Design a protein with these regions (language model features):
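Secreted peptidase-domain scaffold signal
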Residues: 4, 31, 159-165
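Substrate-binding/access-modulating region of protease and related hydrolase catalytic domains
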Residues: 1-53, 63, 72, 90-104, ...
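Subtilisin-like serine protease catalytic core
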Residues: 20, 51-54, 63-64, 71-75, ...
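Substrate-binding/active-site groove segments that recognize
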Residues: 76-77, 155
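Hydrolase catalytic cores
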Residues: 24, 82-150, 154, 160-162
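Carbohydrate-associated surface elements
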Residues: 60
């Protein structure tokens, strides 16, 4: 389920905070109100992405360009592919879609992989802060792109990780 609104909701913020307190990372899309400002000077705010306790994910394309629709602000934590994403569509069809709602699940999946590896290696469940730190170990920043556009960058699990662009 995708959710995003321009107005803060105490109930939604409380739900996010409570989930994180219980060890459940809350990964959300940053929002699709971006205006294509590559310098990140324009701030587009969406909730729950603007909550400190949520992990906000913006979108990039396959060429490592920030998607023009992806929100930019100080709350963006990571970016992931969110342009020309192949997905199931009604009536047994497939479609190419775009949006930060398609980028966020890639970060969620990355967290699941890291959590399982942590459990296998250390024989205990990591807390949300440890998971976030593990995720950060596998990020790569896009050069010459404002931090408000990409947060810590994109996830790279490849063996020979190299800086892009």
């Amino acid at each position: 389920c995708s959710i995003g609104c321009a107005v803060n909701s105490y109930d939604m913020e409380n739900a996010v905070r409570n989930a994180v307190k219980k060890g459940i990372p809350v990964v959300v899309s940053s929002g699709n109100e971006g205006r294509g400002d590559v310098n990140g000077a324009i701030r587009e705010i969406s909730y729950p992405a603007a909550y400190d306790d949520s992990i906000s994910v913006g979108a990039m394309d396959r060429n490592f360009n920030i998607a023009s629709f992806s929100n930019s602000n100080e709350f963006v934590d990571f970016i992931a592919p969110g342009v020309q994403m192949l997905t199931a569509y009604p009536n047994n069809q497939y479609a190419l879609v775009e949006g930060t709602s398609f980028a966020a699940p890639l970060i969620s999946g990355s967290l699941i992989l890291l959590k399982q590896k942590f459990i296998n290696d250390f024989k205990r469940v990591p807390n949300e802060t440890e998971l976030y730190g593990l995720l950060m170990k596998f990020t790569r920043e896009l050069q010459d792109i404002n931090k408000q556009m990409q947060g810590h960058g994109y996830i790279d699990f490849s063996i020979n990780r190299k800086k892009r662009r």
